[in-house]
């Protein structure tokens, strides 16, 4: 029995080694794919690791230590919050809604979202506030589980409540 136990443990060690080896080859393949992407976008690769720079012209901010959001969109925190940056020969601003750079003409004054996205946001806000008595997305329900709706003139909704003398008893929630 002792021989079987040691034989079984050896088998497990070999199997775990194989799993580790598979994981190493998977990560190597992912790194090669990442390098190919960088090579296509920047023209050359950095052998010490993937090249992570802000996409703004002449910005040398190292994105390795940046937050995931900034790495994902390839923009450093300074340029994401800047009122204007020089990118591709144009003055642009980073839109928080689109997560892209747009021309300055697409923004209202010092806003951080472009007009197109703000218009959609405002439309959704107006649409939902007119439909519900309790405000935008509150999720409050009326009688019989139906959402209490207001009419076009925003009149009051009539509700009939049980008489105080009746035998109606409220259930106590514990």
From Swiss-Prot:
First and last residues of each zinc finger (SBP-type) = 51-128
Report the Pfam families cross-referenced here. SBP (PF03110)
Q: Annotated region Disordered: where?
A: 1-42, 118-148, 155-174
The main location is nucleus
Q: For this chain's UniProt record, which GO biological process terms are given?
A: flower development; regulation of DNA-templated transcription; regulation of vegetative phase change
Which Gene3D superfamilies does this chain map to? Transcription factor, SBP-box domain
- Per the record's keyword annotation, is Transcription included, yes or no? yes
Q: Which InterPro entries match?
A: SBP-like (IPR044817), SBP_dom (IPR004333), SBP_fam (IPR017238), SBP_sf (IPR036893)
Q: Recite the UniProt keywords alphabetically.
A: Cytoplasm, DNA-binding, Metal-binding, Nucleus, Transcription, Transcription regulation, Zinc, Zinc-finger
Q: Where is this motif: Bipartite nuclear localization signal?
A: 111-127
Q: Which cofactor does it need?
A: Zn(2+)
In this chain, composition skew of type Acidic residues spans 19-33
Where found? Nucleus; Cytoplasm
Q: Which residues lie in coiled coils?
A: none
- Single GO term (MF): zinc ion binding
GO cellular component terms, A-Z: cytoplasm; nucleus
Q: Domain annotation text? A: The SBP-type zinc finger is required for the binding to DNA.
Describe the function of this protein.
Trans-acting factor that binds specifically to the consensus nucleotide sequence 5'-TNCGTACAA-3' of AP1 promoter. Promotes both vegetative phase change and flowering.
UniProt-recorded name of the protein: Squamosa promoter-binding-like protein 4
Please give the organism: Arabidopsis thaliana (Mouse-ear cress)
């Amino acid at each position: 029995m002792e021989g079987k136990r040691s034989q079984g443990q050896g088998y497990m060690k070999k199997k775990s080694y194989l799993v580790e080896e598979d994981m190493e080859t998977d990560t190597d393949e992912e790194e090669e794919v990442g390098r190919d992407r960088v090579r296509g976008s920047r023209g050359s690769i950095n052998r010490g690791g993937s090249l992570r720079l802000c996409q703004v012209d002449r910005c040398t901010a190292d994105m390795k230590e940046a937050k995931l959001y900034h790495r994902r969109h390839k923009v450093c925190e300074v340029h994401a919050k800047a009122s204007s940056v020089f990118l591709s020969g144009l003055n642009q601003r980073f839109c928080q809604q689109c997560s892209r750079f747009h021309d300055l003409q697409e923004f209202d004054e010092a806003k951080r979202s472009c007009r197109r996205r703000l218009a959609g946001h405002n439309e959704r806000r107006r649409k939902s506030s007119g439909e519900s008595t309790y405000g935008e997305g509150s999720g409050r329900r009326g009688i019989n589980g139906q959402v209490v709706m207001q009419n076009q003139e925003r009149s009051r909704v009539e509700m009939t409540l049980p008489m105080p003398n009746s035998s109606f008893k409220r259930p106590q929630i514990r």
